[in-house]
From Swiss-Prot:
Cofactor binding note from Swiss-Prot or TrEMBL: Binds 1 heme b (iron(II)-protoporphyrin IX) group non-covalently per subunit.
Posttranslational mods: Predicted to be exported by the Tat system. The position of the signal peptide cleavage has not been experimentally proven.
Reaction(s) this enzyme catalyzes, per UniProt: heme b + 2 H(+) = protoporphyrin IX + Fe(2+)
Signal peptide residues on this chain, from the entry's feature table: 1-35
One GO cellular component term: periplasmic space
Oxidoreductase keyword on record: yes
Effect after changing residue 366 to W: Loss of deferrochelatase activity
Name assigned to this protein: Deferrochelatase
Species this protein is from: Escherichia coli O157:H7
Residues the record lists as binding heme b: 236-238, 329, 334-336, 347
Cellular localization per UniProt: Periplasm
Documented effect of changing residue 347 to E: Loss of deferrochelatase activity. Great decrease in peroxidase activity on guaiacol, and loss of peroxidase activity on catechol. Still binds heme
UniProt-reported outcome of changing residue 236 to F: Loss of deferrochelatase activity
Amino acid sequence: MQYEDKNGVNEPSRRRLLKGIGALALAGSCPVAHAQKTQSAPGTLSPVARNEKQPFYGEHQAGILTPQQAAMMLVAFDVLASDKADLERLFRLLTQRFAFLTQGGAAPETPNPRLPPLDSGILGGYIAPDNLTITLSVGHSLFDERFGLAPQMPKKLQKMTRFPNDSLDAALCHGDVLLQICANTQDTVIHALRDIIKHTPDLLSVRWKREGFISDHAARSKGKETPINLLGFKDGTANPDSQNDKLMQKVVWVTADQQEPAWTIGGSYQAVRLIQFRVEFWDRTPLKEQQTIFGRDKQTGAPLGMQHEHDVPDYASDPEGKGIALDSHIRLANPRTAESESSLMLRRGYSYSLGVTNSGQLDMGLLFVCYQHDLEKGFLTVQKRLNGEALEEYVKPIGGGYFFALPGVKDANDYLGSALLRV
């Protein structure tokens, strides 16, 4: 069911404003309430935070360089479109929904109560932008024979295959398209997903879904504080500076000199890995061994033998690995050689917690997400270096896939994937 919406943020309705004025009047009659009226209730965001928004139009999609929000969801879909025209309809529709949801506005009213409501209603009558980003990526399978797109497939895009330590569940792998939905709060993420599914019943079918989180204080630091994963270590310390445009052109974005299809310029290769942690086993492992495995101090995040989280380890002066073990995670992931400079990538991972496994173990771990201009030089090269690392005893990749994050939407007349479908 279609309806018209506005991309700009609308003010709450008159009724809601009057209700708010009435509540303030009651609060003013109570000295304690009056003294605390500028504070947000525990566990809630301030009105300013709820109205934070990221720009939707631009050369690149939001949600890649955007400082990590507190809540995240990965949703892979199978595309039900029957031909290229249907696929264009899907991408245009997704663009319209993303534009509205990320900028906020009044929830649509349902003209006929005998019909299903036009909105789920879980955010109330006003849909605050809440720092929402929705990033659309396409998988290897979208370039099969259905839509005639095979000649336009990104050169390095491929189906994810098993690494030695993987225990992949087919139900948690791959997808024609992937949505990365992030916001300040989980309810905004869920609302966005339900809106998208409601508008695409004949075009998309959910393949798998996982929800993630980082701490509120890490999210509110706008990238200045490194999130801590569920093994208790800082996750993403060695990330390249996402505010350095020149560096991001080198590390994250596909550029014109890469001999890729022209439509891919401004996009990025995305690797997704759903990694289960053996947290009970980890929690019984001595601290010294944990730190040796990672190569970092658990509390400060500093490389072993150093003082601060962002101190750069000097492996050349420690060739035998007496300070930082040769098979430590940080040393294998980034040996800091001239050759390893080409395998830099931007990580954007989140923790997850799902309950218990069939064996009665806690089901929690990491939703690993990274972006790079070249999948083979980036994630695949790094993962090959990590094969056999000591950390493998405590982690088990169970799903994910490789995708290509589409370039951004130029303006209101453009749509996601337009350059791909116009070829």
